[in-house]
UniProtKB/Swiss-Prot annotation:
It comes from Oryza sativa subsp. japonica (Rice). It holds the Pfam family CBFD_NFYB_HMF. Component of the NF-Y/HAP transcription factor complex. The NF-Y complex stimulates the transcription of various genes by recognizing and binding to a CCAAT motif in promoters. May regulate the expression of photosynthetic genes, and may be involved in chloroplast and amyloplast development. This is Nuclear transcription factor Y subunit B-4. Ubiquitous. Residues 9-20 have a biased composition (Gly residues). Residues 117-130 have a biased composition (Basic and acidic residues).
Length: 143
């Protein structure tokens, strides 16, 4: 059994008052494993419990960031959380190092998808191959 975000145990047994199915609360373990494998050597192995721990941490992180963005939207009497709100909440919660790269990514995404709501993407020139922090592996190729 694993402990849920609210401190209650989630396990088999099915009662109706639980938080929901684990697969509904977590990103798919296969996706977590695929992302983790990018950070270890080719011959490296990742234990199942490591993937499960990261899966829980990722879900908690998403809830943490989204909750702050949701509070902001409530104060502004808006019903929809957008990418700008999530980036704002990351800066507010101490993840400032990610704010500028995420703003850049969001701008490029919006330009590619043709969605410029809430942004000034059309005012900024776009560079199609952008490299972040001098790391060619972190570029947005083909955008």
């Amino acid at each position: 059994m694993s402990e849920g975000f609210d401190g209650t145990e989630n396990g088999g047994g099915g009662g109706g008052g639980g938080v929901g199915k684990e697969q509904d609360r977590f990103l798919p373990i296969a996706n977590i494993g695929r992302i983790m494998r990018r950070a270890v050597p080719e011959n490296g192995k990742i234990a199942k419990d490591s993937k499960e721990s990261v899966q829980e941490c990722v879900s908690e992180f998403i809830s943490f960031i989204t909750s702050e963005a949701s509070d902001k939207c409530l104060k502004e009497k808006r019903k929809t959380i957008n990418g700008d709100d999530l980036i704002w909440s990351m800066g507010t919660l101490g993840f400032e190092d990610y704010v500028e790269p995420l703003k850049l990514y969001l701008r490029l995404y919006r330009e590619t998808e043709g969605d410029t709501k809430g942004s000034r993407a059309s005012e900024l020139p776009v560079k199609k191959d952008v490299v972040l922090n001098g790391d060619p592996g972190s570029s947005f190729e083909g955008m």
